[in-house]
Curated annotation (Swiss-Prot):
NADP(+) binds at residues 161-163, 186, 227. Keywords: Amino-acid biosynthesis, Histidine biosynthesis, Hydrolase, Methionine biosynthesis, Multifunctional enzyme, NADP, One-carbon metabolism, Oxidoreductase, Purine biosynthesis. It comes from Frankia casuarinae (strain DSM 45818 / CECT 9043 / HFP020203 / CcI3). The gene is folD1. GO terms for cellular component: cytosol. It catalyses: (6R)-5,10-methylene-5,6,7,8-tetrahydrofolate + NADP(+) = (6R)-5,10-methenyltetrahydrofolate + NADPH; (6R)-5,10-methenyltetrahydrofolate + H2O = (6R)-10-formyltetrahydrofolate + H(+). This is Bifunctional protein FolD 1.
Length: 276
């Protein structure tokens, strides 16, 4: 079985980001990503720090904004950042405080700066096959499959999870690669048998070790998007110990989808800066 090392793939993408950041700098442009952090959630803070640290290594300027208080104040912060011509990309960390929805927040992010595909218009453009930034986690799934040379065209793909951040957008991205996609969720009947027919399984539910060996046909590729912190550390949707004896390829947790997601946010920021 191949373990699909997201860290090494992220490093490859990072070399491209460094080169492009240097070209922009030579033209007098500093690619800048604004991270809006309206929550005191420790995991969100931790991830914001990872983004900031990674950005610094590849030549992208990262600025953290920590608005607190009423939803209106948070939206005002997003509007201020959106109007700043020196900012090229914007992401808003979740969970959001009460009184704010992802849709409302996304509508305040201009699509040209929406490097994590949070604006509903970005998802709509994705569905229509128009240029847009896809949510970075969903894009990371396709990036990993592409770099691992796992064929998507004609492949049967089972996506477990139908959320707007991963399940729906990754299904659209896979359809664009000519895959045959089945979306499964909590109401799906016969989930195990459906998954077992797939050449590729993408699981994004947040339910630890949901996907066992019985889900996986021999040789299938399994992309584990789930991340849950337990007393023993991070675990994913996939029971890696069981699945590794059956799958042909598997992303680890941690070290799989996560590092690629972070680097794609920075690559998107570069692309947004280039288009500005």
């Amino acid at each position: 079985m191949r373990m699909l090392d997201g860290r090494s793939m992220a490093a490859e993408i990072g070399r491209y980001v460094v080169d492009e950041a240097e070209r922009l700098a030579a033209a007098g442009v500093t690619p800048t990503l604004a991270v809006v952090l309206p929550t005191a959630d420790p995991a969100a803070y931790s991830y914001a720090e990872i983004i900031e640290r990674t950005a610094g290594k590849v030549g992208v300027h990262c600025v953290l904004h920590e608005p607190k208080g009423e939803p209106a104040a948070i939206l005002d912060t997003i509007d201020t950042v959106a109007a700043d011509p020196t900012v090229h990309g914007i992401i808003v960390q979740t969970p959001l405080p009460g009184g704010l929805t992802s849709r409302e927040v996304g509508e305040h992010i201009p699509t040209a700066k929406d490097v994590d595909g949070m604006n509903p218009s970005s998802l709509g453009r994705l569905a229509l096959g128009l240029p847009s930034f896809a949510p970075a986690t969903a894009a990371a799934v396709v990036e990993i499959l592409t770099r691992a040379r796992i064929p998507m065209s004609g492949a049967r793909v089972c996506v477990i999870g139908r959320g707007p951040v991963v399940g729906k957008p990754v299904s659209l991205l896979l359809l664009a690669e000519d895959a045959t996609v089945t979306i499964c969720h909590s109401r799906t009947k016969g989930l195990v048998s459906i998954a077992h027919e797939a050449d590729i399984i993408v699981s994004a539910t947040g339910h630890p070790r949901l996907v066992g060996a019985g889900f996986v046909r021999p040789g299938a590729a399994v992309i584990d998007v789930g991340t849950v912190v337990t007393e023993t550390g991070q675990v994913g949707d996939v029971d890696a110990a069981a699945v590794s004896s059956v799958a042909g390829a598997l992303t680890p947790v941690p070290g799989g989808v996560g590092p690629v997601t972070t680097m794609l946010l920075l690559r998107n920021t570069i692309r947004a800066a280039r288009a500005a």
